[in-house]
From Swiss-Prot:
Signal peptide: none annotated. One of its GO terms (molecular function) is mechanosensitive monoatomic ion channel activity. Pfam families: MscL. InterPro entries: Mechanosensitive_channel_CS, MS_channel, MSC/AndL, MscL_channel. The keyword Ion transport applies. The chain crosses the membrane at residues 9-29, 32-52, 75-95. One of its GO terms (cellular component) is plasma membrane. It is a multi-pass membrane protein. This is Large-conductance mechanosensitive channel. Keywords: Cell inner membrane, Cell membrane, Ion channel, Ion transport, Membrane, Transmembrane, Transmembrane helix, Transport. It comes from the Bacteria.
């Protein structure tokens, strides 16, 4: 089997494609959350704290500037993304649990076979 054919089979497998879609959606979702944090949440927090720009907060040690405001903004960004993923996983697990608890519908063939089994059991007990 050629290397190219093996790679194609690997890439087209369900799990790899699911992972690729998840990564693309994750990157897009991260951009949305970053825009939310940078454009809405942090300016509101800065306004509540007296109109300061949180992302611009820093202090200097010697010739080095420590930008702790930018770090704080990224921590808030991470917390929002992590919480959203947590909620999504909880929802998926809940839906899977509900689906697992549902009884499987009985097909007509199974119902007929069950009736035949019951009739045979009754007839054999009469003998």
């Amino acid at each position: 089997m050629s290397l190219l054919k093996e790679f194609k089979e690997f890439a087209m497998r369900g799990n790899v494609m699911d992972l690729a879609v998840a990564v693309v959606m994750g990157v897009a979702f991260n951009k949305i959350v970053t825009a939310l944090v940078d454009g809405i949440i942090m300016p509101c927090v800065g306004l509540l704290l007296g109109g300061i720009n949180i992302a611009g907060l820093s202090f200097t040690v010697g010739d080095v500037q420590i930008k702790w405001g930018n770090f704080l903004q990224n921590v808030i960004d991470f917390i929002i993304v992590a919480f959203a993923i947590f909620v999504l996983i909880k929802l998926i697990n809940l839906l899977q649990r509900k689906k697992a608890n549902e009884p499987e519908p009985v097909t007509p063939e199974i119902q007929l076979l069950t009736e035949i089994r019951d009739l045979l059991a009754r007839n054999s007990s009469k003998i």
